[in-house]
């Protein structure tokens, strides 16, 4: 329950979360449970604005909970929705830009069936997942192809537009496994780097792969 999660020590919650990754989600979930249990007296907020104030909850999650949980008229914009709207309206604004996100959120809100928001949100997400797919979309049988800007222009594959590519960075660590009488030395990471507040074997971060290979 939310109450049990709220009073549980964070270290215990980490242990139960072990292996799932994304530990920031674990921390946010714990903090949100405490807010609901203690500050809100166990009552889950029932407005978009209040839900958005919960730690770890962004516009997408807040809209989804508002629509599916409370029947409120908020458009849910996920990858499927971005794809459907960008192709149908021929919008070449990058979906990963701040202005692009605002444009698509407003467009989705304008298209929303106010009195049937949950059904509409589910329908457009399902449509993007099964018909207006990223690869090999079913344009030939799509019921909206006569009005789809990208289909009529033969540019379906060009949408949605993205401006950023995630740049991966390699890091090299040398870990020390120190054992004495069946017990191992570990340390707790601090700061805001990777694995924050998690336990690890003592280690050094090396500057280059060559240095790591010859350590």
Predicted feature residues:
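Catalytic cores of DNA base-excision repair glycosylases
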Residues: 1-140, 144-153, 157
